[in-house]
Amino acid sequence: MSDSFSARLEAAVSALPARFPGPGGAVAVLKDGEVLVRHGWGYANVERRIPFTPSTLFRMCSITKQFTCGTLLDLYDDPSELDADVDARLPQLDEPSPGMLHLAHNQSGLRDYWAVAMLHGAPIEGYFGDREARRVIDGTRTLQFQPGTSYSYVNQNFRLISDILQDRTGRSFAELLQTSIFNPVGMERAILAAETRAMPDGTVGYEGSVESGFRPAINNIWWTGDAGLGASLDDMIAWERFIDETRDAPDSLYRRLTVPVTFSDGQPAPYGFGLQRTKMFGRDVTMHGGALRGWRSHRLHVASERLSVVVMFNHMSAAQVASAQILAAALGVPYEPERSTQQPTALYGTYLERETGLSARIEPAPGGAKLRYLMVPELLEGISATRAEAGSVVVKAQETAEGAEAVMERPGENRTSILARCDETPGEDIAELAGVYRCEELDEAEVTIELAGGVVYGGFSGILGDGRMEMLQRLAKDVWVLPCPRALDHTAPGDWTLAFERQGGSVTAVRVGCWLARDLMYQRV
């Protein structure tokens, strides 16, 4: 290891607490199977003054998904043996069920149950356990797309996997993780920490910021195969060393987890067996992040370099950015690429995606544009006045007989869609929107629209209760969004699009959706 390599890495690691301030954190870097960095700082619990160390138990959240799939592959050479078990757990589905591999690759077509729970009126910090999960999953009647044809992030895919493994083996998922993963790998402290209210060693996750102050985050979810792993930095180091030690074995677990995955049409898929597959700084990378209120983590592995990075924060800073900065330092490449100064002026405006009914807002941003479509905004580089793109999306303006449109290509989702430009001129009578709308797909869940002092508010209700009333934001004629910045899970749905539909001039229905749960029709009561 050269002096310049050591200096770059030391500088990047030393900068983490200031760049990502919060109660505490930990980082590990491994190269060629050797631990180069193993460091914790700050406090796992600031009230009790418990230090954050490499042995501190941490809530790994969605990093769990690769371990769930690892357990699946350890127990079943051919996971499709369990396809009938998936079908049995979707009793009301009116179309062919996804198979087990569709679940593992996030190609199931299901709507994410944390998002759907908000449509059912789930309180943001309310209890959500096995019973609540089962009620939401059992209510599934339709899919967002035919299994295998596209990608969408769906947490219950992995809950279904762990539940099915429990039923098939007659053993708890905690025991299965222990025998299939923890013991062989040497993850000595790792556990299934299903209850999110507390960790057994007192580690706490915190909401807030330096400006507002940090406070313990309140969570009341019970997790299993989707996000239930509790592990220390030392446990994750053991995982990364196991990956390196078994790298040349043809049937090694990580080799099986990272085998190339495709969609049903043969196009390469960016996600498989609980792992994202991408390129960073010109290298192939497998990785995943984890998040819950108060907890952020990220791990990545560059097989060609035999290089791994693990980052944990017990606060809400962007662990994925931190891990990317550490990776850039380890590779000796700049973290921030040069960006274009071209402004895609022809794209700016508000659109409605025809296929899903989701809103898309394209706004000016330094070097290009900001696209508001997913849970969080995407920064696009301006290529020309009519084109902007990022690694996962391309948007191009076009004129058709029906007017100005844009084409949005999302190769990672294996789909291309048309964005129809919306009429942003004011003028409709907002009082006509008020009323109650009901969704047959969601067991008669409702959205209530009211005018409070002349201001439009909306709220969801369903089998989990009555949700908060939120002030709606008008985007265009009959197109509004209901903000959802906080939810049961950390990665909230974001903005729910409410696209009102009229017949004979009267509002009769509203099409509701977000990227995690799309295209749900609510009829006016």
Curated annotation (Swiss-Prot):
Q: How is its activity regulated?
A: Inhibited by beta-lactam compounds such as 6-aminopenicillic acid, 7-aminocephalosporanic acid, benzylpenicillin and ampicillin. Inhibited by p-chloromercuribenzoate.
Q: Which residues form the active site?
A: S62, K65
On whether tRNA-binding is a keyword of this UniProt record, the answer is no
Q: Which cysteine residues pair off into disulfide bonds?
A: none
Q: Which UniProt keywords apply?
A: Aminopeptidase, Hydrolase, Protease
Top enzyme category: hydrolase
Biological process terms from the Gene Ontology for this record are: proteolysis
Pfam families (alphabetical): Beta-lactamase, DAP_B
Region (Important for specificity) spans which residues? 485-495
Q: Name one GO molecular function term.
A: aminopeptidase activity
Sites where the protein binds substrate: D489
Q: What's its catalytic activity?
A: Release of an N-terminal D-amino acid from a peptide, Xaa-|-Yaa-, in which Xaa is preferably D-Ala, D-Ser or D-Thr. D-amino acid amides and methyl esters also are hydrolyzed, as is glycine amide
Query: Which Enzyme Commission numbers does its entry carry?
Result: 3.4.11.19
PANTHER family to which the protein is assigned, alphabetical? BETA-LACTAMASE-RELATED DOMAIN-CONTAINING PROTEIN, D-ALANYL-D-ALANINE-CARBOXYPEPTIDASE/ENDOPEPTIDASE AMPH
Q: Which HAMAP family match?
A: D_aminopeptidase
Task: Report the function annotation for this chain.
Answer: Hydrolyzes N-terminal residues in D-amino acid-containing peptides.
Q: How does it assemble?
A: Homodimer.
Give the UniProt family note.
Belongs to the peptidase S12 family.
Its name, as the record gives it, is D-aminopeptidase
Q: Which gene encodes it?
A: dap
